[in-house]
């Protein structure tokens, strides 16, 4: 299957990496062409996150996202965007077995979507995989701290970095990802001082989600910041309350259909005289 044509106006990976310590990088998730069109004019990169398993498919965790699912949604986002770089999550089980398998699956994502890069979750044990991919031309964004694909191991969606052991591990994860060739690293659900220290001590941009305003950029799940859901993590700020607007619109529609005020004269076709 051929890739979706990619705009030559898109942000590039070298451009994103060069933003280290400069103006903050703006990122949001998108899972469809429709949402990508709204995000694209304002984002430096769009993340097609495996969070789509929960947001779009109603799953309890991100673990159920499949490679084909990520590719399908990635293709849709590529069709709906022109300016932003597009980074696609490699789903759970698609890169852990061996560097060779990770490369095969990463190439599928890149070639079938035309996206800019892939993202991997984990820790220092994945450094050889990242090195293998980057040595073969696959741009990689890392993801450390609270890693949703490891939710079973972590015992839930728990903030990381409270203990000295966690802090030392996450700092080493960041250093090892940088050394392996990752162009950026997402810091999710970590204590603010830890995020600040990591940002100061690596030469690649840090992208925070529940981390620190001191990070080199921020990313949020679009549906969370738009207020689709009543309950969101503490680190989310709702910039709108579209969930309430949608409920009202659907309720008004149902009422209009029930009392036959819709369709009205403006919504129907009369025979031409």
Curated annotation (Swiss-Prot):
Subcellular location: Cytoplasm
UniProt-listed InterPro entries: Pantoate_hydroxy_MeTrfase, Pyrv/PenolPyrv_kinase-like_dom, Pyrv_kinase-like_dom_sf
Named cofactor requirement(s): Mg(2+)
Active site feature: 188
Any GO molecular function: 3-methyl-2-oxobutanoate hydroxymethyltransferase activity
UniProt protein name: 3-methyl-2-oxobutanoate hydroxymethyltransferase 2
Short name of one Pfam family: Pantoate_transf
Subunit structure: Homodecamer; pentamer of dimers.
Keyword Transmembrane helix assigned: no
Native organism: Zymomonas mobilis subsp. mobilis (strain ATCC 31821 / ZM4 / CP4)
């Amino acid at each position: 299957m051929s890739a979706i044509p990619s705009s030559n106006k898109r942000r590039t990976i070298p451009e994103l990496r060069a933003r280290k310590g400069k103006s903050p990088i703006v990122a949001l998730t998108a899972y469809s062409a429709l949402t990508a069109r709204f995000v694209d004019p304002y984002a430096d990169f769009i993340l097609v996150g495996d969070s789509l398993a929960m947001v779009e498919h109603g799953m309890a965790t991100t673990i159920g996202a499949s490679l084909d699912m990520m590719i399908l949604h990635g293709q849709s986002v590529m069709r709906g965007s022109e300016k932003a770089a597009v980074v696609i999550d490699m789903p759970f089980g698609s890169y852990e077995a061996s560097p060779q398998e990770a490369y095969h699956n990463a190439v599928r994502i890149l070639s079938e979507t035309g996206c800019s890069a892939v993202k991997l979750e984990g820790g220092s044990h994945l450094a050889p995989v990242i090195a293998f991919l980057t040595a073969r031309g696959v741009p990689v964004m890392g993801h450390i701290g609270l890693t949703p694909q490891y939710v079973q191991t972590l015992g839930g969606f728990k903030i990381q970095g409270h203990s000295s052991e966690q802090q030392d591990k996450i700092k080493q994860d960041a250093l090892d990802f940088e050394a392996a060739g990752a162009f950026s690293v997402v810091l999710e659900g970590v204590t603010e001082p830890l995020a600040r220290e990591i940002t100061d001590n690596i030469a690649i941009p840090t992208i925070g989600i529940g981390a620190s305003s001191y990070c080199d950029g921020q990313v949020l799940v679009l549906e969370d910041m738009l207020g689709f859901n009543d309950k969101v993590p503490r680190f989310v700020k709702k910039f709108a309350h579209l969930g309430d607007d949608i409920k009202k619109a659907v309720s008004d529609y149902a009422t209009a259909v029930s009392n036959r005020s819709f369709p009205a004269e403006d919504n129907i076709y009369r025979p031409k005289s």
